[in-house]
Amino acid sequence: MKKYLAVLIASLLIILAGCGPENGTAEQTTKAASLNAISADEIDTTVGKSDQDAAYDESSATKITLTGASASISGNGASQKDGVVTIQQEGTYLVSGTLENGQLVVDAADTEKVQIVLQNVSIDCSDHAALFIKQADKVFLTLAEGTENTLSSGSSYALGDDDSNVDGVIFSRADLTMNGSGSLAVNAAYKHAVVSKDDLVVTGGQYAIKAENGGGLYGKDCVKITGGAFTIATGTDAIQANNAEKADQGYVYISGGTFDLTAGTDAVQAETVLRIDGGTFQITSGGGSANASIDKSGKDSPGWGMWGPQSEQNPSQDAESTDTSDSAKGLKAGASLSLRGGTFSINSSDDSIHSNGTVTITGGTLSLKSGDDGVHAGDALLIEEGTIKISQSYE
């Protein structure tokens, strides 16, 4: 314990509420902060066997071969019209080939589960989501071993009354799990890369995500990641859960994986609880600590706080988030932030680690460079174990 205290005394700057100014970009009061949010021990960290199992029966699956402007289908449960392939029944669907200015849609019963296996797929949709999960109970997006897959969308969407909130290259109104060992590149020119309006679970795969005007991996109710390799470059948040209406939702749980995150605003943001048990993280947010709150002369930096593109940070929803300004934190939670393991290298314009409520560190190795606070807890801070080094901070 003494060695941890020594590290803290030598290199840790910790700001608690009332101990330092928050400048003009202070955390705004959010619904999440006023909720009696559950603790980091109480969130649902369960990841089911089906989420982790990327196996499939090729002999019984429906095969969809994309052929440029159309598709051929062998099996039941899917149809094609004018470059739009629609999956309508529960089952496993093997998808291969290229679709130019087309779309893959899931519109099954809300009690049905669908597995989509990508086998060297390229889909580009100029004016809508490349993969639109309109309805289902749950969809498993499996990246077949040894395959390279790409989903892209254009810079503007043509939306109607029934799809006015669609804002991702992958957009799901059902629970979405991404697994397998293949690779997936997601290129978002409009807003976000991957959006689930329910749970978003990732258990494997290699992901290269670019979203200049939006975010990377967004799950409304929660984001759970147990494995995978992620390179994410975004204009807003790289990973986010944003349900502020329910105390047991809006959380992010990560237990493993490698993460190279470059975010215009927050790198990982949870409306309620952010819990990380393991993983390797290389994080840059808001341009990094060089974009600091205080300039070299000791004066407030006039441009500090102008992070991200001039567009909404959160995926389209019914005004669930009440933040009135963006932030550019490394790790951010609305109620509780718990670090229990992992290796972190965080270079942030804003606070490197921030919670409006509590911060608990019981493990992990942290190397922090901050343009504002190193670690900020609005209510309480507990450090029991771990190695923490802050080489730069301004408050």
Specify the residue positions occupied by each region the protein language model found.
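A composition-driven surface/loop motif
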Residues: 5-395
